[in-house]
Amino acid sequence: MGAITLDGKATRDEIFVDLKQRVAALTAAGRTPGLGTILVGDDPGSQAYVRGKHADCAKVGITSIRRDLPADISTAALNDTIDELNANPECTGYIVQLPLPKQLDENAALERVDPDKDADGLHPTNLGRLVLNNPAPLPCTPRGIVHLLRRYDVEIAGAHVVVIGRGVTVGRPLGLLLTRRSENATVTLCHTGTRDLPALTRQADIVVAAVGVPHLLTADMVRPGAAVLDVGVSRVDGKLAGDVHPDVWEVAGHVSPNPGGVGPLTRAFLLTNVVELAERE
């Protein structure tokens, strides 16, 4: 008997139905939300990702605001674009698409974004608000993970969650989300310096793999019946591969596919952050 699929696409569609109604109410009140993107250069992956975000906007009625800039843009010109979106009343929230070309300082660009227009929830101010449990846009991927677990009635309160990966977009903020009183999980954050990773993952009720190492998590590392979320993305022989080996499906109780699991919810909660920012205005 295989694991239950944590279906991110179906869950995203449910979220979009809700967002469409909320956007319609905001529009009727004269406050249509707008999502902005700043894309520098012509990286195919980044272009596809931005196109997907704006296609999502069209589905729920959010206004799209695109700023596509040349790869050789100066820091001053990028700053001008960020400042313009900070001041643009039609732009409720926006993102600076990463990676940026090498001549640009990514951290400086992200810090220049108005924290109250931070659609990704990754501005240093908003990460600080998360630590303090103050209202702020939440990081999209961690929020999607928590939502997906709840959608499929995976018990979070009291659960031991092992997160593999300490990146700023997933691992670190996910630990903060899961240890809030509203979630009440116990979190072990693992990384390249962790000793005996399999011993830790075998104790876990929930494992989140977010490192970008193909098929890192194998069946012998998973406790029977555990929930496993596959977040990392890499390429093997030109094809997308996740961090979770296919044999895990025969042992785990729940597994998120990759693609089609957490990824769709990352995009859904980007839009959710924008709608919530509009509702606060």
From Swiss-Prot:
<comment type="pathway">
    <text>One-carbon metabolism; tetrahydrofolate interconversion.</text>
</comment>
<comment type="similarity">
    <text>Belongs to the tetrahydrofolate dehydrogenase/cyclohydrolase family.</text>
</comment>
<keyword id="KW-0658">Purine biosynthesis</keyword>
<keyword id="KW-0028">Amino-acid biosynthesis</keyword>
<dbReference type="GO" id="GO:0035999">
    <property type="term" value="P:tetrahydrofolate interconversion"/>
</dbReference>
<keyword id="KW-0486">Methionine biosynthesis</keyword>
<comment type="subunit">
    <text>Homodimer.</text>
</comment>
<keyword id="KW-0560">Oxidoreductase</keyword>
<dbReference type="InterPro" id="IPR046346">
    <property type="entry name" value="Aminoacid_DH-like_N_sf"/>
</dbReference>
<dbReference type="GO" id="GO:0005829">
    <property type="term" value="C:cytosol"/>
</dbReference>
<keyword id="KW-0554">One-carbon metabolism</keyword>
<dbReference type="GO" id="GO:0000105">
    <property type="term" value="P:L-histidine biosynthetic process"/>
</dbReference>
<keyword id="KW-0378">Hydrolase</keyword>
<dbReference type="GO" id="GO:0004477">
    <property type="term" value="F:methenyltetrahydrofolate cyclohydrolase activity"/>
</dbReference>
<dbReference type="Pfam" id="PF00763">
    <property type="entry name" value="THF_DHG_CYH"/>
</dbReference>
<feature type="binding site">
    <location>
        <begin position="165"/>
        <end position="167"/>
    </location>
    <ligand>
        <name>NADP(+)</name>
    </ligand>
</feature>
<dbReference type="GO" id="GO:0004488">
    <property type="term" value="F:methylenetetrahydrofolate dehydrogenase (NADP+) activity"/>
</dbReference>
<dbReference type="GO" id="GO:0006164">
    <property type="term" value="P:purine nucleotide biosynthetic process"/>
</dbReference>
<keyword id="KW-0368">Histidine biosynthesis</keyword>
<keyword id="KW-0521">NADP</keyword>
<protein>
    <recommendedName>
        <fullName>Bifunctional protein FolD</fullName>
        <ecNumber>1.5.1.5</ecNumber>
        <ecNumber>3.5.4.9</ecNumber>
    </recommendedName>
</protein>
<feature type="binding site">
    <location>
        <position position="192"/>
    </location>
    <ligand>
        <name>NADP(+)</name>
    </ligand>
</feature>
<dbReference type="InterPro" id="IPR020631">
    <property type="entry name" value="THF_DH/CycHdrlase_NAD-bd_dom"/>
</dbReference>
<dbReference type="InterPro" id="IPR036291">
    <property type="entry name" value="NAD(P)-bd_dom_sf"/>
</dbReference>
<dbReference type="GO" id="GO:0009086">
    <property type="term" value="P:methionine biosynthetic process"/>
</dbReference>
<feature type="binding site">
    <location>
        <position position="233"/>
    </location>
    <ligand>
        <name>NADP(+)</name>
    </ligand>
</feature>
<keyword id="KW-0511">Multifunctional enzyme</keyword>
<dbReference type="InterPro" id="IPR020630">
    <property type="entry name" value="THF_DH/CycHdrlase_cat_dom"/>
</dbReference>
<comment type="function">
    <text>Catalyzes the oxidation of 5,10-methylenetetrahydrofolate to 5,10-methenyltetrahydrofolate and then the hydrolysis of 5,10-methenyltetrahydrofolate to 10-formyltetrahydrofolate.</text>
</comment>
<dbReference type="Pfam" id="PF02882">
    <property type="entry name" value="THF_DHG_CYH_C"/>
</dbReference>
<dbReference type="InterPro" id="IPR000672">
    <property type="entry name" value="THF_DH/CycHdrlase"/>
</dbReference>
